[in-house]
């Protein structure tokens, strides 16, 4: 590491970190019915709100001004309402509102209180809005429809599991519902709106991942990504007869070795936009559905694309795009010419995007020779071996991909390398790989931490005396697992809202989340010994590394009791620990001032404890 960077005044370093953390995001486009405008969510004002912009680009207008962050927005097919979900205090108990496109007429549709609500789609005639909620049973997420004007709630489903409406049939008499009994398995159902009668669309044996489904323009086919009877998600379809009875699942299109992440189907049902995940990077295909032929495979503006959304006339496609050196922005593709237009331009004052570091995809074996991979971010004048931080993603069934990360860029600017791995249990590498950490197999994922250390030191990237570890949510669990299982390998750690005690996690998290997490982690009623053995809190006496703990007070995904346990235990043992609690955040830090504080605290922590060649030594 460059000594000049290591010794840079905190004030100078903090101003650079603030500039990186202030880089805005614009995401989740939703077109007006005439295609003239797009609504989207952006933190241009400091907290995510609803904005709208001309479909040809230009200066956006802010629509909402909530104190709390907006999660999603959907424009009604009639054009008269925007449906908006808001996270009070940043937590999971979202509130659903409707508001006029000009910002007037704000109306709350959900009740106050600790109820989980999620925004679903509009029916095609704009009469009904779908909402997922656990208002009936805290341990289950049910689907409801709300009729515009009456604003009354009508149940669509009332069964155990995590359910969500993916789409309505054209006449709004039936809806396609996704239901997951537990993580890693799901089904699609066709549900009659009036009677709640369900027809299973996807009978199968064994686990299957089913993602965002879309109904064809005529209502006779349902398209969706799935790994039913295969390793990777492909484009699947089910034909519906006039009575709604389904035919067998058909495989329409695949991409060997890649997962179909998301899709959209044009309003006339003629074309599909397919987003593939190929080794962590996105690839876009526009496909003619009647023939199955490829229309265009354009180069994307950045490494990652999300939220594919056709314009009402089907001539253009809006996407959220981002990359290691590209902020999160919305782009529009003119399909016939394959020309891209930027609809938004997230500000990046004080940051030259061309100076940001792009990662390299590296591969290495686990102890049992299972292939692992990671994204490696190296400072431009990095002196090997040097200070290195391992960063673990959340999930567990998440995936490290080359998204824009202000924290990674801040660390490499401070002269610290970042190795961000995908260990067993990560998504994007096939069905078998993602289930290799289920229940008692989790010990294998924890052992993979040591394989990551071995790669970093064996390639002379990391100084073995100056290695840190960090991660958020499940990545926070992996952080604390690394610090307890391999204490001599780490000089410092940063635990972002991570699980440290599976017993208290199950006791205090959202009941519906606890219900679907038993297969992934273990059943607290029948596998208590397993959960205790996997919980870092029961090995806390092994920790010697300086530990930074960051959490949101309103987190009901991983409740703050997890942070409180680890902080109290480390303080009692005189292990260096710092606790940063955000009173206005939930599971993740979205407000600008909090992003800045968290990033500054993290970079300061690793700069302090990894700059010395003696593990854990104070500067």
Regions found by a protein language model. Give the residues of each.
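N-terminal cap/lid segment of alpha/beta-hydrolase-fold proteins
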Residues: 342-382
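Beta-propeller blade-edge and WD-like acidic-aromatic loop motif
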Residues: 2-16, 37, 41-62, 80-81, ...
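Active-site-proximal cap/loop segments of hydrolase catalytic domains
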Residues: 423-619
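Residue-level signal for short, function-critical loop segments
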Residues: 380, 394-395, 473, 553
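Short substrate-entry loop that stabilizes the transition state in hydrolases
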Residues: 382-386, 391-429
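Conserved beta-propeller blade repeats
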Residues: 22-41, 67-85, 96, 112-132, ...
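Conserved hydrophobic/aromatic pocket- or pore-lining residues that grip, position, or stack substrates
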Residues: 235, 330, 364, 374, ...
């Amino acid at each position: 590491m460059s000594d000049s960077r290591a010794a840079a005044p905190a004030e100078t370093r903090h101003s650079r970190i603030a500039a990186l953390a202030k880089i805005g995001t614009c995401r989740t486009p939703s077109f007006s019915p005439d295609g003239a405008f797009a609504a989207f969510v952006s933190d241009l004002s400091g907290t995510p709100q609803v904005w709208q912009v001309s479909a040809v680009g230009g200066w956006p207008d802010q629509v909402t001004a909530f104190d709390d962050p907006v999660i999603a927005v959907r424009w009604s097919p009639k054009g008269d309402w925007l449906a908006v979900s808001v996270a009070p205090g940043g937590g999971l108990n979202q509130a659903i509102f409707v508001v006029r496109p000009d910002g007037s007429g704000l109306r709350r549709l959900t009740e106050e209180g600790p109820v989980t609500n999620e925004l679903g789609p509009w029916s095609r005639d704009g009469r009904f809005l779908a909402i997922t909620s656990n208002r009936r049973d805290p341990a289950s997420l049910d689907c409801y429809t709300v009729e515009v004007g009456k604003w009354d709630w009508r149940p669509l489903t009332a069964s155990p599991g995590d359910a969500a409406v993916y789409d309505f049939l054209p006449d709004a008499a039936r809806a396609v519902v996704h239901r997951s009994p537990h993580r890693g398995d799901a089904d699609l159902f066709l549900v009659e709106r009036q009677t709640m009668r369900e027809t299973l669309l996807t009978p199968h044996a064994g686990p299957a991942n089913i993602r965002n489904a879309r109904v064809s323009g005529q209502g006779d086919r349902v398209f969706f990504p799935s790994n039913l009877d295969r390793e990777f998600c492909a484009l699947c379809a089910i034909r519906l007869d006039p009575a709604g009875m389904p035919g067998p699942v058909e495989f329409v299109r695949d991409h060997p070795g890649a997962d179909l992440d998301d899709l959209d189907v044009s309003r006339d049902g003629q074309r599909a936009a397919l987003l593939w995940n190929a080794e962590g990077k996105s690839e876009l295909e526009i496909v003619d559905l009647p023939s199955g032929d490829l229309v265009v495979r354009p180069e994307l503006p950045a490494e990652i694309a999300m939220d594919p959304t056709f314009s009402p006339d089907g001539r253009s496609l809006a996407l959220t795009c981002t990359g290691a050196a590209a902020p999160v922005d919305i782009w529009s593709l003119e399909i016939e010419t394959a020309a891209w237009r930027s609809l938004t331009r997230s500000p990046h004052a004080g940051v030259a995007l061309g100076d940001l570091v792009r990662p390299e995809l590296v591969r290495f074996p686990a102890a049992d020779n299972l292939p692992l991979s990671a994204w490696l971010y190296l400072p431009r004048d990095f002196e090997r071996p040097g200070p290195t931080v391992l960063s673990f993603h959340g999930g567990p069934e998440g995936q490290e991909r080359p998204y824009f990360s202000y924290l990674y860029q801040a660390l490499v600017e401070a002269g610290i390398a970042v190795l961000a791995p995908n260990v067993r249990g990560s998504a994007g590498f096939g069905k078998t790989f993602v289930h290799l950490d289920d229940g008692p197999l989790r010990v294998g994922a924890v052992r993979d931490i040591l394989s990551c250390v071995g790669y970093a030191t064996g390639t002379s990237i990391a100084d073995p005396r100056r290695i840190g570890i960090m991660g958020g949510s499940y990545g926070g669990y992996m952080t604390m697992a690394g610090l307890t299982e391999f204490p001599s390998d780490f000089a410092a750690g940063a635990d972002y809202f991570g699980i440290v005690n599976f017993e208290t996690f199950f006791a205090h998290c959202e009941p519906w989340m606890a219900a679907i997490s038993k297969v992934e982690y273990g059943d607290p009623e029948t596998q208590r010994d397993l959960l205790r053995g996997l919980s870092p809190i029961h090995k806390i006496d092994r920790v010697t590394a300086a530990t930074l703990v960051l959490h949101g007070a309103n987190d009901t995904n991983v409740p703050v009791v997890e942070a409180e346990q680890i902080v109290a235990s480390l303080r009692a043992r005189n292990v260096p620990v710092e606790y940063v609690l955000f009173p206005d955040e939930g599971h993740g830090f979205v407000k600008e001032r909090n992003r800045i504080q968290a990033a500054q605290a993290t970079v300061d922590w690793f700069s302090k404890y990894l700059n010395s060649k003696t593990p854990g030594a104070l500067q």
